[in-house]
Amino acid sequence: NQIAFVKSNPTVCKSLVIDTIDWAERLCIEHICASHNKKGIEDFGYGNGYTYVSEEFGRLLNRLQELVDIGVNVVLTAHAQIKKFEQPDEMGAYDRWELKLGKKTTSQTAPLVKEWCDLLLFCNYKTHVVATDDKGKKHKAQGGTRVMYTEHHPAWDAKNRHGLPFEVPLAYGSIAHIFERQEQSPQSNPTPVQ
């Protein structure tokens, strides 16, 4: 309902923030179960419930894209979780940060979100490691700064379609120029070919 309201009244806000997309996924699952009179998503049998989630989540992203198309910025926040990642051609596994979506739905909904967005930023606390002894054999982490990573890394997913540097300070000023550029560019509505 909120998306439809903003679409009908695009001057009501410049940005719509969904905090968080993992909770939106839970609401999506509850909506699907209530619509089909099911107690849980697995009650559909043969994985059909997860297909419904993927389809409904795709419809949500389509509705959000309609807002983007009329000049409203859409921001999706998400929690992250560490998962063990193992590549067949590598020796051993390593930890990797991923979107925290449902255990059985993440393989379908996470790619939809990642493909849809223009910016996928990974926020982290960058610590500084210093030697604590004269020989430089003992180290400790101290201080640090909050940063946003804008490009893919083995330890996290990130992307940007705006040419941002690999790492930027966790501050609106780091990405403000993207939104200012979008506000200045006129919205063009191409004439359909007859």
What label would you give each PLM region?
Residues 23-111:
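P-loop NTPase motor core
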Residues 83-194:
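Conserved GTP-binding G-domain of TRAFAC-class P-loop NTPases and closely related GTPase folds
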Residues 14, 72-73, 117-118:
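Conserved acidic residues
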Residues 1-14:
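Nucleotide-state-sensitive switch-loop elements of NTP-binding domains
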Residues 17, 75-79, 121-123:
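Short, conserved beta-strand edge motifs with alternating hydrophobic and charged residues
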Residues 20:
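Walker B catalytic acidic pair
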